Amino acid sequence: MKKYFALLNTIVLTFMIHMPLQAQEIDPMSDTWVCNDGLGRVVASMDRGVTRKQVDENCQVGMFYYVWHGQHGAEVKDITRLLEADPVNPAWGSVNQFHWGGKPAMGYYTGGDRFIVAHHMQQLMDAGIDFYFFDVTNAFTYDAQVQVVMDEIDRRMRLGLKYPKLAFLLHSSSEKTSLHLYEKWYKNKPENDHYWFYWNGKPLMMMDYDARKTCDAAVRNHFTLRGSWAWEEGEDKWPWLAYYPQNYNFSNETGKKVYEQMTVATAMHPVSKIGKSYSGGSEPAVNKYGLTARTSRGAFFEEQFKQAIKMHPRVLMLTQWNEWMAQRFVTDESNKALTRPGATPKAGETYFVDVYNQEFNRDIEPSSESLIRDNYYMQLVSNVRKYRGAREIPVPEACKSIDLSGDFAQWDDVTPSFIDEPGDCEYTSSTAQKAESLKRRTNDIVLCKVAKDADSLYFYVQSTKHLIAPSISNAETWMTLLLNSDMNYSNGWEGYDYMISRSGTGDHYYIYTWNGETQKWDEGKEISWIKYANQMMLSMAKSDVALESDVDFDFKWIDNTPKNTTEILDFLCNGDVAPNARFNYRYKGSKLVSPESDALQHVDASGKRARVEVYNLSGVKMMTAVCSTSLKGLGQLCLPQGTYLAKFGNKSKKFTKK
């Protein structure tokens, strides 16, 4: 018995030593962020596009994830570049050599690059992904690269950030590979339990369907096992690829049929000529580069996601994030139909099984290629929200004037708080980031707020540490505020009508207006601002940014992004932006005067409440406010200076807004 307790204590102590400490959870509410994608499509939110009334917490979304880059040869051969140079006779690499299908937005990278792993995880958590399933289908397990992903999970856990759970997808040599993975990561390693995606009370492992019964007994006992391969649907099967319309996959383990999983992909294979534009049972015509007129739009992805949203399975497995590479093979007379898209089928022609170009690949990760960019990532975000649901965009509670000569405690009771993750400036990458951004340190933005009164807008921003002092070299990229005042993403620069930024010649902030004719920012009025330690606030007249009315608007803070950038993909990994990527926060300014809102109940907390109509002295109705029936405190309403008449039932009262 003493030995038993000694062993138990050892296990518990070991677990406590190695288990990362969980910080208080930080929730940036990324499902409330808004934007349009590069094609002008609205990313779904509760303001537009999401019809599910509440978030379904039982939904789990997994992403097929790869760490194999650079592990089978470091030379970069890019099919897209080769086709651009000569689409008829490209300068291929050797037979069996891995080729990239295009260039990622963060550049060609090596599996296990900490900067890349961290930014992938941030992007996927923002998208609502719950777990990764690693590709180990060819029996290579990439242990060192998997460890880097685990390290990033631990880092996020220490910061209190959401992180993905993990599972493995096997195929070739499933028996041998599953035993290796079990002994490497699972056996007698309770300190690793927080990594795993659990299904039916055990870690999930996917493998060859028949190998589930022939693999080692320790594997069978430790895992919930599901068969997984392309197009294999049915009982105890979780495929990673299926034809539209995809079916539910189910289990009968308990003697009762339980519907479990469905897959969604962005395309199939170059050899089958089913690409990203395939829908309605056909692939559009491809040109000599193997591209279609609608490669950028994700028709296959949308068709499959609509089926998943309709059927609403408990687990949705997405194919895929970042395969990027495929081996070069050559046809013979027996398989010349496999010839690459856009080329004449013949023996001796090159083909690639899984990845070819922008049209024929299954990746979602943002790309530097002109037809892809971040279109598929934004399509992912939008459809995950439609599938699971999204939270309401938070609304402000009260109007408030901020005195810039006062202290920062004025902001303590201002809501909502717009959160940005801490720690997203921890790593740098000379291959992924612009050189000018790397030369400077970046402020790690974590909190933003907005306040308003009748005439002015006030903005607050906070970083994790003291704000790094601006210099001449980064004056125009230092702690800059972007405003989309009309929420119209078809005008301005990427929708932004105003930029509030320092000038390059002095310690002053100005309002810059986007000039559609010159495609440049025009300097305008100087505004007031103040910073102290890790906080900063600024103010401007509503009229200076076309926000005289009480309306909603979108905004974003950026720091140390490339100077004079006209490339919004720079926001993926250069400097810090809040919120991430091309997303924006939405300030629901209209809610402060909505008749249905309780936002104005701060007027007199002791009185009874009713809807009070407010008129100017010309008889024009200005607003309907919820306030006390005693009509006290009317001067606190969000109105321009002047005299007004408030009416409630047969009561009326003149009051002055100072």
Segments the model singles out, each with a brief description of its role:
Residues 394-405, 478-506, 533, 542-592:
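Acidic/polar low-complexity flexible segments
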Residues 406, 455-465, 536-542:
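Short, well-ordered beta-strand segments enriched in hydrophobic/aromatic residues
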Residues 24-70, 194-196, 203-204, 212-220, ...:
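N-terminal module-boundary/linker segments of secreted carbohydrate-active enzymes
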